[in-house]
């Protein structure tokens, strides 16, 4: 039975939760090469709640260092196209300092590996991921317009360097297929431990929403399917209806049934938790009915004129060139070209992209 730890925490005492996670899910780290991967969506201040908090990263780095590994690498691949934004993202978020000198730009060196031929015969993955003997994933408790939940499985999408993410988004072509692709990326190298920052979480139009939620928890597990199922349940979702969890379960990667997960700690739903708009992309019901309603319920990105600064970042980052600057210097979406990957929403520095 998979286990998930739920422990009360603040950013001031987070070391206690990290210690407990390592006690419950021990790793033989001495003499091993270790990769620690936080969730670094883009260059933003930690107080915005978009990335793994620096206090969590520092606590994990300190713990790993005390276990005498041969090597520590702290890294992620922020953004969709921007290889050059890697160092900037770590500096602005405070994660560079929290990495205690172990940061590396893991997007600089990549290697091609075999992939699901239904999407692409091969993908590029950061060499640091393949070289690591132990991988510790540090996801953030957040909503996501495409997957509902950003947790352990989705965090592994950052194993792909920027432009590779865009190519895979394009190859998937639709949200349901992208859910399959997310799991296939996760399977390339499944992390050994997940420590999820839920001290301050995100609700609403994630993964870059201004709606933060004080939750006061650290979650941990050695099974991402169980972890993400618990997160979904806390948000008020039925984990069994999330496409990516269904896919992961079908592939034998874990169980999403809460009754079959050993929860260590107090599991409670978050009252009145705001989920992102549901357009039929992330949740699954009757397959035939889903196909009929899919095009009618599909969410599209739209710029909020009160927040948009016409910086053009979303236009530049769109994997399929579905965005252009329209009247009034607001980005406009070509509905026929858009593949609803919502990368524009993720990357917008002003949080001006909403889903409608």
What do the predicted segments below correspond to?
Residues 1-305, 309, 315-320, 324-330, ...:
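N-terminal and secondary-structure boundary signal
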Residues 310-314, 341-344:
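Cysteine-cluster motifs in flexible loop/terminal segments that predominantly coordinate metals
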Residues 326-337, 341:
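Short linker/helix segments within small regulatory modules
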Residues 338-355:
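Short Fe-S-cluster ligation motifs
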